[in-house]
Amino acid sequence: MNKILDISHVYAGYDNNPRIIKDISFSVFRNDFLGIIGPNGGGKTTLLRTIMGLIKPTEGKITFYNDQDMSVSKINIGYLPQLNKIDQKFPITVHEVILSGLSMSRKLPAFTIPQRYKQRVEVVAEQMGVEKLLKRPIGELSGGQLQRVLLGRSIIDNPVLLILDEPISYVDKLFETNFYKILDEINERMAIILVSHDIGTILSTVRNVLCVNESAHYHCGTEISQDWLDKAYDSCPFEIVGHGAVPHRVLRKHQ
């Protein structure tokens, strides 16, 4: 299996805290489906921002690989942020939102959009089930509809890696099931990194698991033990409710 991303002993953070994540090492492979879990404040978002090049590591190395397994300076990455970070009052249509995913990697004409780009938008909209909403302003969409549109935006340029940050935190349970079916289809074409607080969802959806709590614990597969989770979450005790691929409950630190 070919690597697309290799992270080796990476430290990163911000001016007021340059070591939010510490000595993190793991790899992502082509068509991989990696789930990232961990307590709030553990560094999950910092890790994502570092992978996307928004934060520069203070130590360590991030290496990307092309189809020929040669190291390259970057790869095409799609990103779906948390839904609550999207301004639905912004005057833009569904078509324009999906199309904007192309403008991030190539310069689009200011006034006339080439037909091939319009066709690409239509293909992606149909894949997302929003083909009848292309002319609708995003302010008129439900949470589930908007998330489908944003997912379409993140994949329209055929990225090698798709990063999802808590993608279903603000949508209903009915949409959640359909959303993960869409991800399964997308995963046939690209690798996915999925961040979620829902351990049950992670275990039933992904192939491998990474727990980020300043440092990182990688687990190949999803048959993880309570001992492994205890070690991974460290100072954030929790309990697993039920059996198998089930939701978890995070508890306050024990005194």
What are the residue ranges of the model-derived segments?
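Conserved ABC transporter NBD signature motif
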Residues: 60-77
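Catalytic Walker B motif of ABC-type/P-loop ATPase nucleotide-binding domains
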Residues: 162-166
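ABC ATPase nucleotide-binding domains
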Residues: 223-255
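Helix-to-loop junction immediately C-terminal to a conserved catalytic motif
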Residues: 52
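Conserved ABC ATPase "signature" region
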Residues: 114-133
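Conserved ABC ATPase signature
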Residues: 137-141, 145
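A short, flexible loop at the N-terminus of ABC-type nucleotide-binding domains that lies
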Residues: 1-23, 30, 87
